[in-house]
Amino acid sequence: MRMTVRRYRRRRTGSDSLGSTHSPFALPFFDRLEYLSQSINQTRKTDAPFIILVTQDNYFRSGFLSGQSPLSNCCDYSTLDAALSDLNHWPSSRLVVDIESRASPLIDLLDQLRRHSLFAPYLTPYLLVRADDYDARLFCKAAGPFHVLERQLTALGMQQTLLEAPAPAGNRKEWFSRDEWPILQALSQGRSLRQIAQLQNRPYSRIIYRLSCILAKLGLNHRHELLHLLNNLSDFTY
């Protein structure tokens, strides 16, 4: 009986997130060892790349590859799917996603990152956003546990930031919840709030409540401001 109670308590105190019972934003023990070993001598390239870069901007990509180590120790990809596939082999590498040169709407890209960040393998990617793109920076910070960096950072500033690997700003209460995110996706597709209520089989009042939570997290006052923001984020350059 004592053993049964102990096991039950262990289950109760474990994480209620899918996948792992460890802290979702802490690197596993062996990944931390690899991270420390790579930081001892960054002038010597390692088998695992320091950066996994996702961008379609050839000029931006060449800036990393032709730079100094450790930034030049980089594997570059044009799509997020390919990068996530190879990241399984190098869990200690930093995933850096260039938001500016995306080939799809930002909300679609963030949806994919959310599924890999809020659940196993609990990634904490770095998102590069233009300094003057206030809408994208605001939305990315509220979308999940992401490091949002200015795209115009110097090489030294970028290196220091990636080496420090700080905890993501904010907490779960400041990110869009699993009930709010589908509403944002539907709004970005041009659906009305009543249509969303019908699709989700929920009372209209609940959709209005979730909308008010979304507006509060983005610091907006009216849903027209939200629709304008979503319209801006739907544009892509490649």
Language-model-derived ranges and their functions:
Residues 215-238:
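Basic, Lys/Arg-enriched C-terminal extension of HTH/homeodomain DNA-binding domains
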Residues 1-166:
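N-terminal regulatory/sensing modules of transcriptional regulators
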Residues 82, 192, 225:
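Residue-level recognition of oxygen-bearing side chains
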